[in-house]
Amino acid sequence: MKSIAAVVAAGLAFAASATAANAQISDDVVKIGVLTDMSSLYADATGKGSLAAVQMAVADYGGKVKGKPVEVIVADHQNKPDVGLNIARNWYDNDKVDAIFDVPTSSVALPISALTRDKNRININSGGGSSDITGVACSPNTVHWTYDTYSLSNVAGKAMVKRGEDTWFFVTADYAFGMALERDAANVVKEAGDRKSVV
């Protein structure tokens, strides 16, 4: 929970910066949406804990940014990209949310990042881990504050290549994070030389 609180504190500082001033603070209230998983497989790791961390960070920051009060709302994206995207679109278009935080699971995080860019708002992603968030889908409106598949695959992959492993088999989770992890790990192995075999 402390790491989420640190993310929110950094996000609040970001929102107060001149760069973030270009993304409008609407209605004289800084409205933060915690878009998290409250009911699916990431609920225990995020969910209520993420909401509590955001609330603690807002309190620690004094409840204001640039003299404007901070309001926190929360929604459950149910680990479903369409549900998450509909919530985020409604928040930006109707509820005047200025920033979305958390967003566990890459399959939800990627479309939220794209929408955030289109709406010129702020997305502090501490939940999705696909390297595509800061790679092919990179956005100036999204801060990726977590591990990613590039770092995970490079640490483990390079260590195993150095140890002499020469044949690799992947059992891959069939979703955005799993596919990105396999791709990034396979690239590590291929970059190690022709003697390596990826199956």
Q: What are these regions, as identified by a protein language model?
A:
Residues V29, A45-S50, D60, K64-V136, ...:
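Beta-alpha junction/loop-to-helix N-cap segments that form part of ligand/metal-binding clefts
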Residues V29-G47, P104, D166-V171:
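Short beta-strand segments enriched in small/hydrophobic residues
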Residues A20-V34, G63-V70, V161-D166:
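Immediate post-signal peptide segment of exported/extracytoplasmic ligand-binding proteins
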Residues L41-A52, A176-A180:
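Glycine- and acidic-residue-enriched helix-capping/strand-helix junction motifs
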